[in-house]
């Protein structure tokens, strides 16, 4: 068997026909500058080929469902294993996904509660026993005399299929009728069911009229029905068609409540049998929110205070205006009064309606005037009703802007039905258990006392649950709860959850490819992660990690440094081998930082700010313990703390959302806090995250930064364009006129291959240039518009050196380390770190007011040490201009250059949410209680 994975002639993206041998069954780190080609080698070449070879082995029918698998641009790869990629882009946005379902722990929990749970009555809470035939008969005998009823045996409950055997068995048993999905059918006729739908089938065992001497016949019929269905009997009263379920399995004698047989699906919130009937298992409902309908109560109705769709148009002849004028007349207010000055009675009528009370509405139409008498529904009620009724996706989106998620009133966020929540193991229902943190859940399971047969049944289930919880703890996620929605996890958290799931599967001989697993991890938890990666390797797997973290590099068996620069300056193997080999290579930028030849210097002094502060009072979102936090304005401030300590809750949920609403007029609902002081010292908030700058191939750095408008104006001002009468619109690839119509300005044409992957080929008409021939004939300094879009930022800087307006925007792209990115490069091909730096460059190119606060969440994600160096210089420039920069960060190189640090903790989850220490890096390093301080001490 080969002991290397041998890649020959890789040319994906910017790779320059490289060849490399990676040792198998080892921990291999790929490093290099951002954009140097690491991901192209790891994901677009090695992983893509491993995946493609696996899919090739499947039938063409199976391949049809698996989407496209292009052959990567590489000559050959030998020694490849089946590849599993664990990246950060695949966080589930499905509201039904939770940490428990993603890790599959919840499947084992459902099994445990179904097999070992103690059912209770959902009404009175008493433990429930099974009912005997005599008890069922006694209950039925209490019906009033002459009541007509029938007994049914439920033989199929919510199962797909045609169920012909069920009908044949019933005919052979001498039965005449069945009830299917609520309708009665005669068994003498042929019954055809849709095999793709779920059906309920009940055999009608007997039809009876209640009289005193019925007990004997009733007992026989109940027994027959119970035997047919495995213990269930349905009593159907013919006078009101109501059903009562009896179970030989579980029932409460006091309340008459019967429970079905416990089964795993009863505990699934994705199954109608277990889900809460009101919210269908989501745990939340969208409710019209007055604070989003009226985001700014200092405005009057005529100034547009009411922002709900349908009520935001208050022109003279609008229906909304007529209603508001009638309300103003009735409740004696003016439409020019600020909304906050209206009486409670008037506000209630505007928001919740006038009930049955009529308003007198005067209207004018082309055919004359008129008067209407009718009640007003209220804005909140109107939004809620239209949201429930509309079938239009666009309308849903528009109305959603005025709605907020609230816990479901029936299950209070627990997602399951009353019956499912009434079953306990160790005194807890399944959702109470899921709300425990991973570490608490593990200790609950380790101390769970079960007796007799139940202990034997539970043994294997408990072993699986405990091992999976231990793996989650091992990758630094002890603070998460199993009920946490997967969509709320950060990229790093979701990646580590999938890592824990993979360890749980205990595969060997697999190639695992990971993309920066240390993201979002505090230095303290990094050692646990490295132990996990070593464990995965020791099982007999090859672990290939794309990483910039120094600790991971020092722990690796083999390092490959891709570079030497980024983009066109990268794509080569600079060095490969042990840590010492990388340090010894003079061309390796990574080696220079590892050896200490290059390093990020400490600043000469710390800024104290401009004397003003932004103060958050009473922050209590998620695990925050009612904090009062001060941020000095005019400084570079870092918020630090272990994973789950409350950094994102404080900065993103409370501060950013409040500032965005107050300064940028955004309609968002901030987290829980009392008040924020010091807003008057700011005029703008800018949140710079790693989300894509555009989701279509048409979006690119030139369009995002606003540079493309200037370039189009420049081409439109050339003598050639003026002679032809071309305006700036002629040079847009999004509108008809100048673009190539064969590919609609995309430059690529999609060819559907049905059984094979769709193929994208350059457009034959324009050759991938996006524009038609006439547009491309207009030149500036010998280049056409397509040539300019194909330039890297570095090339463009020299090309436009005499045009300060354009040059300054391009210079900021180069300053943030994106000199290698092409101006027209599709935004879908940019990494998260690159997208973030495009946003930073856009902000840098704007005129600074000195009163802006910039909020960044882990800006060093995806950045090499050399890029972090550049990023810090850019952030310091923003602060030097008088602005405030607030960063959530784990990277010690960024933390050590900050002016002020707010360290949260001390732990994650419930044990976090407090301020451990605030002050300069030196003050934080002196604090014994701060984990951040202990690691920072070594760098100062």
Role assignments for model-derived ranges:
Residues 1-940:
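Conserved phosphate-binding elements of NTP-dependent enzyme cores
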């Amino acid at each position: 068997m080969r002991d290397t994975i041998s890649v020959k002639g890789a040319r994906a993206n910017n790779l320059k026909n490289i060849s490399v041998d990676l040792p198998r069954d080892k921990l291999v780190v790929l490093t290099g500058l951002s954009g140097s080609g690491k991901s192209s080698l790891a994901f677009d070449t090695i992983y893509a080929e491993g995946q493609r070879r696996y899919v090739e082995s499947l039938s063409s029918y199976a391949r049809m469902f698996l989407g496209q698998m292009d052959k990567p641009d590489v000559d050959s790869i030998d020694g490849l294993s089946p590849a599993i990629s664990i990246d950060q882009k695949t966080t589930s946005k499905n509201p039904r996904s939770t940490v428990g379902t993603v890790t599959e722990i919840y499947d084992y929990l459902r099994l445990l509660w179904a097999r070992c749970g103690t059912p209770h009555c959902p009404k009175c809470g008493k433990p429930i026993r099974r009912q005997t035939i005599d008890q069922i008969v006694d209950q039925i005998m209490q019906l009033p005399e002459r009541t007509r009823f029938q007994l049914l045996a439920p033989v199929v409950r919510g199962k797909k299929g045609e169920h012909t055997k069920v009908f044949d068995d019933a005919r052979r048993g001498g039965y005449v009728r069945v009830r299917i999905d609520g309708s009665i059918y005669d068994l003498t006729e042929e019954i055809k069911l849709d095999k793709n739908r779920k059906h309920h089938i009940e055999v009608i065992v007997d039809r009876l009229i209640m009289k005193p001497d019925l007990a004997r016949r009733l007992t026989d019929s109940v027994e027959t029905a119970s035997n047919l269905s495995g213990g269930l009997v349905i009593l159907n009263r013919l006078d009101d068609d109501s059903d009562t379920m009896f179970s030989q399995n579980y029932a409460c004698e006091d309340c008459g409540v019967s429970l079905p047989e416990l089964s795993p699906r009863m505990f699934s919130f994705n199954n109608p049998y277990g889900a809460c009937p009101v919210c269908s298992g989501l745990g939340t409902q969208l409710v019209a929110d007055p604070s989003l309908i009226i985001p700014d109560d200092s405005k009057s109705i005529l100034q547009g205070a009411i922002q709900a769709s349908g009520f935001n148009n208050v022109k003279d002849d609008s229906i909304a205006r007529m209603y508001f004028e009638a309300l103003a007349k009735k409740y004696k207010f003016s439409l020019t009064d600020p909304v906050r000055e209206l009486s409670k009675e008037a506000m209630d009528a505007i928001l919740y309606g006038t009930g049955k009370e009529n308003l007198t509405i005067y209207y004018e139409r082309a055919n004359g005037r008129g008067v209407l008498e009718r009640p007003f529904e209220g804005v909140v009620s109107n939004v809620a009703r239209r949201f429930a009724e509309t079938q239009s996706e666009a309308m849903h989106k528009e109305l959603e802007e005025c709605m907020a998620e609230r816990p479901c009133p029936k299950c209070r966020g627990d997602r399951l039905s009353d019956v499912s929540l009434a079953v306990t193991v160790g005194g807890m229902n399944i959702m109470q258990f899921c709300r425990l943190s991973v570490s608490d859940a593990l200790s609950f399971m380790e101390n769970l006392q079960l007796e007799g047969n139940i202990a034997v049944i539970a043994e294997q289930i408990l072993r699986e649950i405990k091992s999976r919880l231990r793996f989650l703890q091992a990758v630094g996620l002890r603070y998460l709860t199993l009920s946490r929605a997967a969509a709320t996890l950060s990229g790093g958290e979701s990646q580590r959850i999938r890592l824990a799931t993979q360890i749980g599967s205990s595969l060997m001989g697999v190639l695992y490819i990971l993309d920066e697993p240390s993201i979002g991890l505090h230095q303290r938890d990094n050692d646990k992660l490295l132990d996990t990666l070593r464990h995965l390797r020791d099982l007999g797997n090859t672990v290939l990690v794309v990483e910039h973290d120094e600790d991971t590099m020092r722990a690796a068996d083999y390092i490959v440094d891709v570079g030497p620069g980024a983009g066109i300056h990268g794509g080569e193997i600079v060095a490969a081998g042990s840590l010492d080999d990388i340090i010894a290579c003079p061309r390796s930028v990574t080696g220079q930082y590892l050896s200490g030849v290059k390093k990020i210097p400490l600043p000469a002094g710390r800024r104290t700010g401009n004397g003003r502060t932004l103060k958050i009072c009473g922050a209590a979102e998620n695990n925050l313990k009612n904090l009062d936090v001060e941020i000095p304005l005019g400084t570079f401030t870092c918020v630090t703390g272990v994973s789950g300590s409350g950094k994102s809750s404080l900065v993103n949920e409370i501060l950013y959302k409040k500032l965005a609403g107050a300064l940028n007029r955004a309609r968002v609902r901030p987290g829980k806090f009392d008040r924020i002081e010091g807003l008057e010292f700011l005029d703008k908030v800018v949140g710079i995250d790693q989300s894509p700058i555009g989701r279509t191939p048409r979006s690119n750095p030139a369009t995002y930064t606003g540079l493309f408008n200037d370039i189009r104006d420049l081409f439109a001002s050339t003598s050639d364009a003026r002679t032809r009468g071309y305006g700036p619109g002629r040079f847009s690839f999004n509108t008809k006129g100048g673009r190539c119509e064969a590919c609609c300005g995309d430059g690529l044409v999609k060819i559907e291959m049905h059984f094979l992957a769709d193929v994208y080929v350059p457009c034959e008409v324009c050759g991938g240039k996006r524009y038609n021939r006439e547009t491309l004939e207009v030149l500036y300094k010998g280049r056409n518009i397509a040539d300019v879009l194909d330039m890297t930022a570095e090339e463009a800087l020299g090309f436009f050196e005499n045009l300060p307006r354009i040059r300054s925007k391009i210079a900021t792209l180069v300053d943030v380390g994106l000199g290698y990115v092409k101006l027209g490069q599709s935004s879908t091909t940019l990494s998260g770190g690159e997208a973030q730096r495009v946003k930073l460059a856009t902000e840098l190119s704007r005129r600074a007011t000195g009163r802006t606060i910039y909020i960044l969440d882990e800006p060093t994600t995806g950045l090499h040490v050399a890029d972090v160096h550049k990023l810090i210089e850019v952030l310091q420039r923003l602060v030097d201009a008088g602005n405030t920069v607030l960063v959530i960060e784990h990277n010690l190189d960024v933390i050590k250059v900050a002016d002020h640090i707010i360290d949260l903790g001390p732990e994650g989850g419930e044990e976090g949410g407090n301020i451990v220490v605030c002050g300069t890096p030196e003050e934080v390093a002196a604090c014994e209680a701060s984990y951040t301080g202990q690691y920072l001490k070594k760098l100062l």
